[in-house]
Amino acid sequence: MESLLNRLYAALGLDAPEDEPLLIIDDGIQVYFNESDHTLEMCCPFMPLPDDILTLQHFLRLNYASAVTIGADADNTALVALYRLPQTSTEEEALTGFELFISNVKQLKEHYA
């Protein structure tokens, strides 16, 4: 069975990535992919990590209201949006999930970045 990442790329009309999978969308949205045997994870940095704790708490509260999870990157320099799909997802589910993820990232960038 072909990987979910390759099926998503095919659904988007793109060739499968040969090296580190990365898509750049519209206005500089960079989507990185991490694939395991069980999931396909999409990750997109969308703004610098806030300096004040109240702003950071606000973003963490958003995790309760959306399938898109907000976290910090490994260097603790940026907020990232994360979305996971099971490998058993169909091409349609992967495409719908990708579109939902991009829509959420655009909203986050529009309102907060």
From Swiss-Prot:
Keywords from the named record: Chaperone, Cytoplasm, Virulence
Which compartment or compartments is the protein found in? Cytoplasm
Keyword Cytoplasm in record: yes
One GO cellular-component annotation of the UniProt record comes to: cytoplasm
Q: Respond yes or no to whether keyword Chaperone is given for this record.
A: yes
InterPro entries, alphabetically?
A: T3SS_chaperone
Induction is noted as: Transcriptionally regulated by InvF and SicA. Also regulated by SirA.
* NCBIfam families, per database record: PRK15202.1
Subunit description:
Homodimer or higher-order oligomers.
Q: What is this protein's function?
A: Molecular chaperone required for SopB/SigD stabilization and secretion.
The entry's family comment says: Belongs to the IpgE/SigE chaperone family.
For this entry, the protein name equals Chaperone protein SigE
